[in-house]
């Protein structure tokens, strides 16, 4: 196939070929669900939503796993603060996540495992690492991974093990043989609630974060799979430690690794600064959905390549909204011929070439604008159908154009229609001052009225 993907492990863009012909298995690190998802989470899930969509468009069967971390120090702390069971908190936050990302058109994965459902698999994996001489128990009940015993540690992140310093994104715990070692099993603390403790041969406790993903990916995708994704911030230590665990358990001396292609999306900033609650620029998905519709947010994110740094700003969102409206305006009032995509069409061929080049959505979006220009000139039903179909592979332009242009920006359509009716009544009564006042008030809200022989219509400016 013609698809090429940038592999973080090799630092090169490579031709992609799945291990099993015709079937792609992909794992993406999902949310730790103690709070609402923020726009950085949205950026990550959007990136891999596009990946899985394009793999399917390319004729491949996709098994897509995106996990949920539902046991963690932050989760325990938040549940205690609220005085509720951990499961109640994580169920609530999972439902909120599904609602929020659904508004952005992010499709559900094939499997969405919760870490707490795989604790037995995690315990079994830790026991394999013990037998392989890579894990050791310490007084108090913790089990740690011996980093220096794993050959090749640091190859994903490019970090030399001797150059790594204790404390560089690695928690230093008492009882470690080496400051770089990381925890596989955390012994229970007396003050922790009962629902944070699980039984294991090492003693009661809970799994470390890193072992969770190794166990879940192995349980659902097997010892080797095609793509592992996540945010750039997970490259070290999380993904580095996953390699140490999974390869240390199943691939020592085999010449293979458990993942063929590692993908990482770029960092997100807000107004060119790191997103931080202390800076007052921290936004949840829900915060943004109060001001912009989900498709505008999606379109905004797809105008930047998934590996590039992404600057989140109101100016960028406003520009994206205008751009999306231009695309929908091209479809407004034009018959749209439903049809399979003809990939030999020049526009379709350019779109495919862009997406096959490491999912280059900015170039693909530029093709949509070129095609919209052709639709505006020709009013061709076939061109309009192609525009909608190509955009649909990205999760865009699937609403009726008139409906989106009127209501796609979260406006109160009932209020607007009532104001239009009031304006019509004022005009009929020859109260032109009132008619103009209503028109101007709507214009101030970004609503532009169009008077036609058939009546008054409106669009969001």
Swiss-Prot record:
It catalyses: tRNA(Cys) + L-cysteine + ATP = L-cysteinyl-tRNA(Cys) + AMP + diphosphate. InterPro entries: Cys-tRNA-ligase, Cys-tRNA-synt_Ia_DALR, Cys-tRNA/MSH_ligase, CysS_C, Rossmann-like_a/b/a_fold, tRNA-synt_1_cat_dom, tRNAsynth_Ia_anticodon-bd. CDD domains: Anticodon_Ia_Cys, CysRS_core. It is an enzyme of class 6 (ligase). ATP binds at residue 277. A motif ('HIGH' region) lies at residues 31-41. A motif ('KMSKS' region) lies at residues 274-278. Its cofactor is Zn(2+). SUPFAM superfamilies: Anticodon-binding domain of a subclass of class I aminoacyl-tRNA synthetases (SSF47323), Nucleotidylyl transferase (SSF52374). Its EC number is 6.1.1.16. Coiled coil: none annotated. It comes from the Bacteria. It is found in: Cytoplasm. One of its GO terms (molecular function) is cysteine-tRNA ligase activity. Its main location: cytoplasm. SMART domains: DALR_2 (SM00840). The keyword Protein biosynthesis applies. One of its GO terms (biological process) is cysteinyl-tRNA aminoacylation. Binds 1 zinc ion per subunit. Transmembrane segments: none annotated. One of its GO terms (cellular component) is cytosol. Keywords: Aminoacyl-tRNA synthetase, ATP-binding, Cytoplasm, Ligase, Metal-binding, Nucleotide-binding, Protein biosynthesis, Zinc. Monomer. Belongs to the class-I aminoacyl-tRNA synthetase family. NCBIfam families: cysS. This is Cysteine--tRNA ligase. It comes from Methylibium petroleiphilum (strain ATCC BAA-1232 / LMG 22953 / PM1).
């Amino acid at each position: 196939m013609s698809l090429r993907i940038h592999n973080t492990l090799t630092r090169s863009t490579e031709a992609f070929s799945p291990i099993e012909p015709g079937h792609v298995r992909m794992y993406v690190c999902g949310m730790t669900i103690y709070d609402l998802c923020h726009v950085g989470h949205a950026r990550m899930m959007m990136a891999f939503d596009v990946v899985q969509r394009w793999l399917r468009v390319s004729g491949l069967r996709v098994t897509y796993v995106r996990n949920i971390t539902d046991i963690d120090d932050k989760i325990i702390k938040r549940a205690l603060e609220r005085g509720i069971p951990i499961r109640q908190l994580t169920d609530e936050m999972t439902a909120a996540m599904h609602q929020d990302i659904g508004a952005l058109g992010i499709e559900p994965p094939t499997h969405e495992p919760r870490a707490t459902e795989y604790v037995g698999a995690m315990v079994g994996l830790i026991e394999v690492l013990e037998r392989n001489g890579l894990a050791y128990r310490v007084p108090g009940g913790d089990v740690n991974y011996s980093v220096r015993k794993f050959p090749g540690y640091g190859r994903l992140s490019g970090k030399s093990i001797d150059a790594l310093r204790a404390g560089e994104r690695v928690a230093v715990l008492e009882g470690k043989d080496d400051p770089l070692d990381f925890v596989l099993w955390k012994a229970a603390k007396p003050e922790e609630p009962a629902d944070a403790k699980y039984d294991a041969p090492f003693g009661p406790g809970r799994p470390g974060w890193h072992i969770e993903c190794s166990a879940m990916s192995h349980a659902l995708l097997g010892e080797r799979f095609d793509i592992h994704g996540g945010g750039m911030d997970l490259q070290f230590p999380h993904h580095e430690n996953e390699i140490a665990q999974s390869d240390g358990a199943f691939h020592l001396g085999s010449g293979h690794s458990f993942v063929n292609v590692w993908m990482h999306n770029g960092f997100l900033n807000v107004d060119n600064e790191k997103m931080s609650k202390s800076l007052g620029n921290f936004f949840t998905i829900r915060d943004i959905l109060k001001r912009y519709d989900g498709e505008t947010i999606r379109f905004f994110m797809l105008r930047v390549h998934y590996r590039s740094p992404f600057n989140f700003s109101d100016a960028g969102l406003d520009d994206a909204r205008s751009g999306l409206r231009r695309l929908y305006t091209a479809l407004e009032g034009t018959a749209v011929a439903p049809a399979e995509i003809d990939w030999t069409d020049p526009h379709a061929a350019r779109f495919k070439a862009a997406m096959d080049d490491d999912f280059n959505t900015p170039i693909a979006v530029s093709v949509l604008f070129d095609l919209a220009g052709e639709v505006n000139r020709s009013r061709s039903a076939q061109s309009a159908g192609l525009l909608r179909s190509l955009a649909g592979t990205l999760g865009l332009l699937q609403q009726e154009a008139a409906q989106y242009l009127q209501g796609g920006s979260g406006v109160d359509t009932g209020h607007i229609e009532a104001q239009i009716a009031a304006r019509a009544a004022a005009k009929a009564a020859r109260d032109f001052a009132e008619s103009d006042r209503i028109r101007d008030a709507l214009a101030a809200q970004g609503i532009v009225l169009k008077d036609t022989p058939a009546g008054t219509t409106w669009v969001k400016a």
